[in-house]
From Swiss-Prot:
Glycosylated position list: 50
GO MF term list: hydrolase activity
Keyword DNA-binding: no
Alphabetical UniProt keywords: Glycoprotein, Hydrolase, Signal
Induction behaviour: Expressed in tetrathionate-grown cells.
Species whose genome carries this gene: Acidianus ambivalens (Desulfurolobus ambivalens)
Name of the protein: Tetrathionate hydrolase
Gene encoding the protein: tth1
Cellular localization per UniProt: Cell surface
Length: 535
């Protein structure tokens, strides 16, 4: 009888071990490694999903002791890049510490296999600065190592990505700056703003590189065969503990952030794919193919038609004239609703409409975007334009100024507040206010101490943030505070490093910033501009 029990226990043990192996799931209790890593972290490792193996071991480390026990009052949804359709990244909070303002700096890159460079380091000391020059080194570190875009606040956590290879996503306690969980070993650089939907956080990955065969296609005028990045992927993680829920590989990179509406996750790729999936399960709902169209950094947005049908909207680069399109697809079936190019008389150039994520005014039914045009002798116009969100017809286009072509991300992400569009011109280092109904420039302000092309990358690229009656703008090494009524600069505050395509994210009296040098920074607004409370 005892022998039968022993045999039964042995067989049961084999079954349990087999199940754990099948799920590729491991739980490990690690040693104490300091303040950021308390005793007892839980480690999940994944080598495949649904029978398809990963290129890297995906390791998720969860530190439950670092999570906050209180309800911060954050939303459970962050559906698009920069929090909402208008790109105003302001989050309500009930947390007294955030309302009063917290102050911390986290060298995030150090925890995911990179090197967080001190924020006071001059650009000439960056990797490859001697070989590429200061401008090239700043762009390289943003594209290949640090955090290009801003952070996400949802479900009581702050989420940030790193595009150092392999890519990573990290969940951080926004009050203390301690890591709650991190997933390292993604199938490519994570270069965008994570989106969140009711307990699930999503990140898409992919690099900036082209294979040599793409240049052959270009030389042979085979533009429809060109795609960027051999492969990418989309991941869904449990927002609380980081467990992998599902993933799928993509044809071409998946650099831009996806968008979510009513349980549908829509993403685009460098292989000309526009894809809709079930946000909970990852199952395919529809797939569109646009041969030769390349998704760069223009994250997906959406507009809801009066009948309730969502349109997912994204920008694509094309390597021949007109160099870019904005495409809207029906979110229920994937059918193309409309496509648009830059309105005449402007002619798109270079990366075209694939860089800048469009903003959407749901109430007015307007899509706003920004791009370079009329390239000649190294100079371009920086054009902001508006389209009818229902049919894509042009409403207006305005030139915010001509200057040297900026490197890499060639535009300024627009913000819509009321009847005004605020966006940047990285070529000239200006912020512009534009009437959304007419396209009239209301004011234009040059940002002081911001180094611009042709010697430097310039800015601002990320959208401004409107809060407490003020505009908060990040560019170069500074955060600028601007009066939105007349464009007057009230103050500017040194952060250091490089504030690239990112936007300030605000909760209470606290601003959260990502930095290309590999840092996440929390700082009280009252430290940046004490008088803000009077606005």
């Amino acid at each position: 009888m005892n022998l039968k029990i022993l045999v039964g226990l042995f067989i049961l043990g084999i079954i349990i071990l087999s199940a754990m192996t099948f799920l590729n799931f491991t739980t490990i209790v690690a040693q104490d490694k300091g303040d950021q890593q308390p005793k007892g972290p839980i480690v999940y490792t994944y080598t495949e999903y649904n029978g398809t193996y990963f290129p890297h071991i995906l390791t998720v480390v969860y530190y439950p002791c670092n999570a906050t026990c209180s309800n911060l009052g954050f939303p459970s949804v962050w559906p698009v890049s920069n929090e909402n359709q208008c790109h105003n990244a302001v989050v309500n909070t009930t947390c007294q510490a955030l309302i009063e303002g917290v102050d911390w700096q986290l060298p995030l890159l150090n925890y995911v296999g990179g090197v967080a460079i001190p924020l006071s380091t001059p650009p000439c000391k960056l990797p490859w600065a001697q070989q590429l020059g200061v401008k090239g080194a700043l762009v390289y570190y943003t594209q290949m190592v640090g955090e290009p875009l801003g952070v996400t606040l949802a479900c009581g956590l702050l989420y940030a990505t790193e595009d150092s290879m392999p890519g990573s996503i990290t969940a951080i306690n926004p009050v203390t700056g301690k890591i709650v969980w991190m997933a390292n070993g993604l199938a490519g650089p994570a270069m965008n703003n994570p989106v969140v939907w009711h307990g699930i956080v999503y990140v898409s990955v992919g690099g900036v590189c082209f294979t040599f065969s793409q240049f052959v296609h270009f030389e042979d005028h085979q533009y429809c065969k060109i795609h960027r990045g051999r492969c990418g992927a989309v991941y869904a993680f449990n927002a609380t503990n980081g467990q992998l829920l599902w993933m799928r590989f993509t044809y071409g990179e998946a650099m831009p952030a996806p968008a979510i509406y009513d349980g549908i996750l829509a993403y685009v790729t460098g292989g000309g794919c526009f894809v809709g999936v079930n946000a909970t399960t990852g199952q395919t709902l529809w797939v569109d193919h646009f041969p030769g169209f390349i998704a760069n950094m223009a994250s997906v947005n959406y507009y809801v038609l009066p009948n309730g049908t969502p349109l997912f909207i994204a920008g694509f680069t094309y390597t021949a004239p007109p160099y870019g399109y904005i495409i809207a697809v029906n979110g229920l079936n994937g059918h193309e609703a409309w496509n648009a190019t830059m309105p005449a008389p402007y002619v798109g150039a270079n990366t075209g409409l694939g860089d800048v994520a469009p903003a959407v005014d749901q109430q007015l039914g307007i899509v706003v975007d920004n791009d370079i045009a009329n390239f000649s002798n190294g100079y371009v116009d920086m054009v902001t334009f508006a389209l009818n969100a229902t049919n894509g017809k042009p409403l207006w286009a305005v030139n915010t100024g001509r200057g040297p072509i900026p490197p890499a991300y060639k535009g300024g992400m627009p913000l819509i507040v009321g009847n005004v569009v605020y966006d940047g011109n990285p070529s000239l280092g200006t912020v512009n206010a534009i009437c959304i109904k007419t396209g009239k420039i209301l004011w234009s302000t040059k940002l002081p101490c911001l180094q611009t092309p042709p010697k430097f990358p310039g800015g601002p690229r990320g959208s401004p943030t409107y809060y407490h009656g003020l505009l908060w703008v990040s560019a170069g090494q500074y955060v600028y505070v601007i009066n939105p009524k007349n464009g007057d600069i009230l103050t500017f505050y040194w952060i250091g490093g490089r504030l690239g395509i990112m936007n300030p994210v605000i909760a209470g009296n606290t601003m959260f910033l990502s930095n290309s040098y590999g840092w996440i920074v929390a700082i009280p607004l009252s430290q940046i501009y004490p008088a803000y409370i009077y606005y």
